[in-house]
Swiss-Prot record:
One of its GO terms (biological process) is methylation. The gene is tpm. The keyword Nuclease does not apply. GO terms for molecular function: thiopurine S-methyltransferase activity. PANTHER family: THIOPURINE S-METHYLTRANSFERASE (PTHR10259:SF11). InterPro entries: SAM-dependent_MTases_sf, Thiopur_S-MeTfrase_Se/Te_detox, Thiopurine_S-MeTrfase, TPMT. Belongs to the class I-like SAM-binding methyltransferase superfamily. TPMT family. This is Thiopurine S-methyltransferase. It is an enzyme of class 2 (transferase). Pfam families: TPMT. Keywords: Cytoplasm, Methyltransferase, S-adenosyl-L-methionine, Transferase. It catalyses: S-adenosyl-L-methionine + a thiopurine = S-adenosyl-L-homocysteine + a thiopurine S-methylether. Its EC number is 2.1.1.67. HAMAP family: Thiopur_methtran (MF_00812).
């Protein structure tokens, strides 16, 4: 799986992973992080999620990262935002108000950008990556965030033999292994969501849990 996989999904309109609402678990647990007002929050592999609008409404400076320029342009258009555009190395920044999206590869961003992020929200990034790429992603992104960072991570847990990802199953033991060495991942919620996600039952799943973690720099 490479960048072209996701670019093709956006071109073909196969974006069932996009939610037409703010993630309820974000709204429930984000206030518990007690992040300072005005701080920068990273939303990796953001697509055109409405979570970025919600985070900006909470007083944050939002930095999304997305490969597809089509997704980025749709986000600003659908939310009535006029973005300014500037080139930045191999990628492009789109900005409007308190929301900026870096259109490019997240691995091209270094500590000069990621180090300014005090918050992070990952609903769609870790579960979108194949297993071999997840440790590298976590080290690169979370290892370079502000030393004071706090964030939320949402994953899925299901029998991978019943369905091919993405989204992939990322169990608790894997989360702990991936983030060990730079971050603490504390499981704060786990719930069965299969009855609310019939499309996954149609793909053969008999069990589907969502897991919510509070992340912070390892003390």
């Amino acid at each position: 799986m490479d960048a072209e996989f996701w670019l093709e999904r956006w071109r073909d309109g196969r974006t069932h992973f996009h939610q037409q609402r703010v993630t309820p678990l974000l709204a429930k647990y984000w206030p518990t992080l007690q992040l300072p007002p005005g701080c920068r929050v990273l939303v990796p592999l953001c697509g055109k999620t409405l979570d970025m609008v919600w985070l900006a409404q909470q007083g944050h400076q939002v930095l999304g990262v997305e490969l597809s320029s089509l997704a980025v342009e749709q986000f600003f258009a659908e939310n009535g935002l006029q973005a300014t555009v500037r080139e930045a190395g191999p990628g492009t920044y789109y900005s409007a108000g308190d929301i900026s999206i870096y259109c490019g590869d997240i691995f091209d961003l270094g500590a000069d950008v990621l180090g300014d992020c005090v918050g992070a929200f990952d609903r769609a990034a870790l579960v979108a990556l194949p297993a071999a790429m997840r440790p590298r992603y976590a080290r690169h992104v979370y290892g370079q965030l502000s030393a004071a960072y706090r964030g939320l991570l949402i994953t899925l847990d299901y029998d991978q033999s019943q369905m091919d990802g993405p989204p992939f199953s990322v169990r608790d033991d894997e989360v702990q292994a991936i983030y060990a060495g730079h971050s603490e991942a504390v499981l704060i919620d786990r719930r069965d969501i299969l009855s609310k996600e019939p499309k996954f039952a149609e793909r053969g799943l008999t069990q589907l849990d969502t897991l919510v973690y509070r992340l912070q720099r390892q003390g």
